């Protein structure tokens, strides 16, 4: 059975989350498309929030 590719916006969110948990700057967002950039930044915010509250460590 074929695997479906993940939605691009879901992938952008996940990559942003990983960047936030890893402590990267939000200025390093690789997306120029507004929708993808918004999703990436949303994931980044959640990742940073999780790191600050102690859910994740580097």
From Swiss-Prot:
What family is it from?
A: Belongs to the ribosome modulation factor family.
Q: Name one GO cellular component term.
A: cytoplasm
Q: Which gene holds the coding sequence for this protein?
A: rmf
Protein's name in the database: Ribosome modulation factor
According to its UniProt entry, the protein's GO biological process terms are: regulation of translation
Is Cytoplasm one of the keywords UniProt gives this record? yes
**InterPro entries linked:** Ribosome_modulation_factor, RMF_sf
Function, in words:
During stationary phase, converts 70S ribosomes to an inactive dimeric form (100S ribosomes).
Q: Which UniProt keywords apply?
A: Cytoplasm, Translation regulation
What is the scientific name of the source organism? Shewanella amazonensis (strain ATCC BAA-1098 / SB2B)
Locations listed in the record: Cytoplasm
Q: Per its UniProt record, what Pfam families does this chain match? A: RMF (PF04957)
